[in-house]
Amino acid sequence: MRSTAFTVSVNGQPVDVAHAAASYDWVSFDVTGPVEISITAAEAGFWDKGVDIQPWRLGIRPVRQGKTIRFHLAAPAKLSISRPGDFLNNAAMLFVFAGTPPQPPPRAGPHVTIIAAGIHRESLNPKSGDTIYLEPGAFIFGSLNLFKVGGVKVLGRGTIVYEGTQDPTTDEGWMQKPDWHCIGSYDARNVQIEGLTCIVRARTWSIQMKDSFQFTYDDLRVIGGNPGNANQDGMDWLGGGGTIVRNSFFRASDDVFGIQGNWDGYTEEAILAPGKDVTDILVEDSELSTSISNIVRPGWPRKTFSSHNFTLRNSDILHGGIGACGETFALLGFWGAEHAHGEHSDYTFENLFLDDWYSLVQMEMDQDSALPGLHGFTFRNIWAPDQPPLADSNLSGDISGVAFDNVKYGQTVATTDADLPLIVSDGAKAPIFESPKNVVAKFSFDPPVFGVGQVVRFTAEASLGAKYTWLFGDGTEATGRIVSHRFADAEGTMLDGEAGGAGRFRVLLHVVGKTGSGTGNEDWASQGLVVVGKWREAASSAIQTLPGLTWQIFPGNWTELPDLTKEQAVFNGQSPSLSANPQGFVRYAAVWDGLIDIPADGGYTFHLLDRDGARLVIDGVQVARTGPPFAQVCGSPGNAMRYDRGAMGLRAGKHTIHVEGLHSVSEGAPAIYWEGPALPLTLVPVTAYSYARKDVVTR
């Protein structure tokens, strides 16, 4: 269990680092006040390209010194620490669980079992009325089986490590039988689970509840990873409900939460068999992450069941799955395709932060019965602080009563379908868009362009009786409606700003009304501000140009973007923007060269999106490069959309631009967005591109 990938100390005292699954490690310790945390990576240069500490809402930014990072943690928290953009199934990630001390063990009695610290190779099979207390440091290699029991409590601070015998190449994890999940239940009632860590190394559904009711999970930590990167949901309901999940952490390799009426395999008979209702689920105050798929997935093609009263609130979406499995992945993916049947209502998503995410909502209900389908879905106070959506949202079919109430990207509230963006089709009713009603978080700053050490004045929009808290993305914070701040460096919040000579800082504003947070009387705003450490001068104004870009085509069967300096283009041309004519080739790399016209001096962020692989270079500096291709699954063609960004300090005028894009299995050219002084996040317009004119003299 012990990991050598990281060395961790808390207030100078070493803390054991354990290996979880895949390339994930974790540490767990208790705190009673603020602490200083030090993390040293075994790999040389591990942190050189940056550090990403989530949830972003906390505004944590470490100090980096070689292989070591250090940061201050003010209160108990569950953190994910990795390198920027590295959060998929092969990512090297460290999860830090800083908790409050557990309750003392219960008094001895005939129905009380105390499991001491150490290794125990056996499953837990409590009977009705039993209490099991796992001491800190107790490791159970097995399962927690809750079959036809009631009144069970599992308390303490122990760990269950599940290493099952499931086929790693397919889904056998759906089966409902003992020793098949970290926690498995059937027809169980009134169960309390507190302080438990689940490590899941097999390709199985991590926590499965069939026809079970009145479960409460508090301070649960679930970490799953498997080579197939699939079928390892965080928590599934097969009928039942009445569940509360609070103050918990999930890292899944499939949907974090799955809701079905039943699941007895993939045969025609099993898929078409009607399932039982799922009702009354509350998930709150939790951190949610997956390497693939959705955060919440109710429904499946052709399945019949109903569900009501699901709430996810006051939580952070650290990592959403990218790509698609028949349906694009999202915060909510409701896949009621191929004549699924049922009524699903009263789903609420409230006070949620979207850190690394893909799309907001995908809802499809292809139903031909008289049931009312999907209705009463509310998305309220959804804050995406620092990344745009990578895919459109969709409402399709028998859907009504969808409301988007203060869905906010940075400082901008979505008030139209185009703002999300959202496609409504096949009879779905148009959604309602609303803006915040009580307090509003919105701010301005001056000057619009600044460098290291310069004073920046921040002014929040006034809300009567509100309190204002600023997190500047450099590890510092302030209170008050109007504050001043100096940024001490140009490395950015993620310490990834050195290459371009400028760093992007994620500035957050939290506004709380008179009645306090958690009541709907709060709002957040965010903006990425670029601190310029080094200016890039514009090209000579004497250069004569033509509109558009030049391009070259490099045929090849690459699976990742190659080093094109070693390749030979077969033909070339010019185009208005990032388009090219491959002249019949279907697998190739394209290169575009030219100039990009910067409208004003300032710190700019460039956002790069592409499916097969792309690279953006400005003034000879690599600004962004998307990650390796990530295949979509379940028959969805092509690769998922990948994303990267970078910041630069650019003088007004023309700057050289070089773009590379691979075309292997997906359609579409790279997309480049920019933002800067008085320039909101938007696609770089065609008019910004040009290339140097070359006159040819003929005799």
Q: Language model features by range: what are they?
A:
Residues 504, 522-523, 528, 533-699:
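Acidic/polar, compositionally biased interaction segments
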Residues 83, 511-513, 659-661:
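Conserved structural position at the C-terminal beta-strand
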Residues 31-36, 449-457, 600-603:
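Short coil/turn motif common to extracellular beta-sandwich-like domains
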Residues 437-535, 676, 698-699:
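Extracellular/lumenal mature domains of secreted and surface-exposed proteins
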Residues 33-35, 75-79, 189, 213, ...:
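Short tyrosine-centred short linear motifs in exposed loops/low-complexity segments
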Residues 87-104, 518-531, 670-671:
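Edge beta-strands of extracellular beta-sandwich domains
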Residues 1-439:
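Extracellular/periplasmic carbohydrate-active domains that bind, remodel
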Residues 9, 133-134, 471-472, 617, ...:
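A general beta-strand register signal
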